[in-house]
Amino acid sequence: MGKALVIVESPAKAKTINKYLGSDYVVKSSVGHIRDLPTSGSAAKKSADSTSTKTAKKPKKDERGALVNRMGVDPWHNWEAHYEVLPGKEKVVSELKQLAEKADHIYLATDLDREGEAIAWHLREVIGGDDARYSRVVFNEITKNAIRQAFNKPGELNIDRVNAQQARRFMDRVVGYMVSPLLWKKIARGLSAGRVQSVAVRLVVEREREIKAFVPEEFWEVDASTTTPSGEALALQVTHQNDKPFRPVNKEQTQAAVSLLEKARYSVLEREDKPTTSKPGAPFITSTLQQAASTRLGFGVKKTMMMAQRLYEAGYITYMRTDSTNLSQDAVNMVRGYISDNFGKKYLPESPNQYASKENSQEAHEAIRPSDVNVMAESLKDMEADAQKLYQLIWRQFVACQMTPAKYDSTTLTVGAGDFRLKARGRILRFDGWTKVMPALRKGDEDRILPAVNKGDALTLVELTPAQHFTKPPARFSEASLVKELEKRGIGRPSTYASIISTIQDRGYVRVENRRFYAEKMGEIVTDRLEENFRELMNYDFTAQMENSLDQVANHEAEWKAVLDHFFSDFTQQLDKAEKDPEEGGMRPNQMVLTSIDCPTCGRKMGIRTASTGVFLGCSGYALPPKERCKTTINLVPENEVLNVLEGEDAETNALRAKRRCPKCGTAMDSYLIDPKRKLHVCGNNPTCDGYEIEEGEFRIKGYDGPIVECEKCGSEMHLKMGRFGKYMACTNEECKNTRKILRNGEVAPPKEDPVPLPELPCEKSDAYFVLRDGAAGVFLAANTFPKSRETRAPLVEELYRFRDRLPEKLRYLADAPQQDPEGNKTMVRFSRKTKQQYVSSEKDGKATGWSAFYVDGKWVEGKK
């Protein structure tokens, strides 16, 4: 009798499952997806593993045929798709096919969400054979008991869930491949659009505009320091004057109030004592885990999901992509037993705490929890420190969610002083309850003990402290709060949040600074154009409804191709109109805002333009016929608009107060340096609003305050410049093109040696040859055709020795390093980011041996890393 083949999608998951299955099973990994829609027009070849069984036809030589070839899916012919084995996965597929031929049965044990279902379906389609040979097994946690139960009751592939995943993929493909070329034509090359990503960018853009339109308003608060009859200190805040909320808007009003308060008599009007409770939060779902990891651990969404994936695959937590707060009965019994044994009965509620899941959540799924509550974070020796921290957070939330409420005695004191009312609030913890395992992030102002005073007691004024404040604009999104907003609006699902957050940053429409989102100007322009021409596509409710439609497909409540057809019909109508000229209702181009600045080359006026790389000045003569065209541009150096995280929550308000306001629409203006004598202030709503101002004076680029830098090649001074990739130092000698980077710490990068061509060393992945380059992370070999070929690798010491005479003097010591370790393994040059020094190490079969040598006091010394 042969063995059964079990296929999972990750090697780590395969390793864990293998521990629980006997010798009758062979567990192998597909290493993620094995096939997908083509990345180029190669779909025209229609590979043998296509989902279609029709005879391959020669593609028509028209635009539609070419588009279908590129997309790999044909929305005009019943959504016929052409899947291809992913590059590099041929060997994996071949091995799985060979194992499948020998296997008695094949178990598809990929993840339990739609993505996992789709991977399982692709595996079955590619491997082939009788469908009866395949079984689908799913489990919420990788434990011995869960694995045994899953294999005792295997099921079949859920084709509805597969179709829901395909429908999402096809819609995203259509939008990306059909709208992006329109953006290239109308706005700028290299732009892209996405069905969900563009809506997420809209959220960031709208928040950016709310912030720029916000005008901070001044207001004042007055605190009073008093003492009680027994001499205890009592801090109060003025809340009312003449029974109206106290909110003076300037210093004069505040001083008038202070004068009255200084003469008033203070007495306690009311003391209110009442018990309050604080209930624990629900166990984590994907979005709340991402938010808690951001707030408590400082993790980004991508890092959180990567750590959670590793914990799941190692068997330590349940599946991490879920929107259900449901807990299995076994899990509830387990944690209640743990609470009773370790904290006592007073921490255990009479009945389990229940939490409501949102509408459309997958109740069959569980919340994210530890597989075994008795396993502590410190015992996860095979996990990295960040994974242990995330596990501890999940463990704490799981245990806390089934504990009793925390109990407090809350006190409110109301004090009278003439026409004024003052208040003080305090809270005393009487029973810690769930906070014993999940402490609060920080104590609020109420978490203080108020002195024992009663109604009628007189207080003595010690000091009045007026403080100026300004109203704050809406807070910028963090990764976690953007996920929360997407979830609230029903956009995306647990399995897509992380990819949405990553994609909108990769596209260059937004950026993250100090863990907060900023909209790029091109992101604003693209959002405006898409909103004007694709209202449904950019509509929050429509996007949420489409998510619901996909849920219906997964639940066998809707036919997937009917959903796609309805979407495509509306979409193509909008696309056809958008492709027309603006006069006919088509998409507006990326217009220039003309200025009074003269072109230094031809004298025509320069205009404010926006490209993917940022805002710049371009000559209006660029629109002329080729022979008359002027291509002159002027780089604009943006003022440092990134907020200093150390400034705290007032940073955004302070930045807005410092900005100029557009004379036409009142929006905060963005400021740029044209040259050392001119600064350009551009309306934050540019190019929709053409407001701008030119300021003259003496200016310089912020970013380098060190000593004068001398060019190492010609001896001239180097000055700070701003380019498409940021700030750099450039030689002032026009004949010398030398430049040097500005490092993150603000220092000028040390001089780098010129590349050394090594035509004797051919590249493996192209016809190029290697050159030896000196970079920020030491020397490395790179293709001479960069960026066409991006092949790089570390140089072998024996290679450097071979070409020692070509190396600059500064690098020749590397050629003198040991060429082999004591075991005869070849050595290569590496760079330590910790010490900023180069060293050599050896490898065997692609893995580090642990041997290394370091250059110390003019000689090479062997030593362990």
Curated annotation (Swiss-Prot):
Has been used to construct a 2,4,6-trinitrotoluene (TNT) biosensor strain. Binds two Mg(2+) ions per subunit. The magnesium ions form salt bridges with both the protein and the DNA. Can also accept other divalent metal cations, such as Mn(2+) or Ca(2+). Pfam families: Topoisom_bac (PF01131), Toprim (PF01751), Zn_ribbon_bTOP1 (PF21372), Zn_ribbon_Top1 (PF01396), Zn_Ribbon_Topo (PF08272). Mg(2+) binds at E9, D111. It catalyses: ATP-independent breakage of single-stranded DNA, followed by passage and rejoining. Residues 192-197 are annotated as: Interaction with DNA. Its cofactor is Mn(2+); Ca(2+). One of its GO terms (biological process) is DNA topological change. InterPro entries: TOP1_Znf, Topo_IA, Topo_IA_2, Topo_IA_AS, Topo_IA_cen, Topo_IA_cen_sub1, Topo_IA_cen_sub2, Topo_IA_cen_sub3. GO terms for molecular function: DNA binding; DNA topoisomerase activity; DNA topoisomerase type I (single strand cut, ATP-independent) activity; RNA topoisomerase activity; zinc ion binding. Keywords: DNA-binding, Isomerase, Magnesium, Metal-binding, Repeat, Topoisomerase, Zinc, Zinc-finger. Induction: Transcription is increased specifically in response to 2,4,6-trinitrotoluene (TNT) and its indicator compounds 1,3-DNB, 2,4-DNT, and 2,6-DNT. Changing E115A: Abolishes both magnesium binding and enzyme activity. The keyword Metal-binding applies. The keyword Membrane does not apply. Releases the supercoiling and torsional tension of DNA, which is introduced during the DNA replication and transcription, by transiently cleaving and rejoining one strand of the DNA duplex. Introduces a single-strand break via transesterification at a target site in duplex DNA. The scissile phosphodiester is attacked by the catalytic tyrosine of the enzyme, resulting in the formation of a DNA-(5'-phosphotyrosyl)-enzyme intermediate and the expulsion of a 3'-OH DNA strand. The free DNA strand then undergoes passage around the unbroken strand, thus removing DNA supercoils. PANTHER family: DNA TOPOISOMERASE, DNA TOPOISOMERASE, TYPE IA, CORE. This is DNA topoisomerase 1.
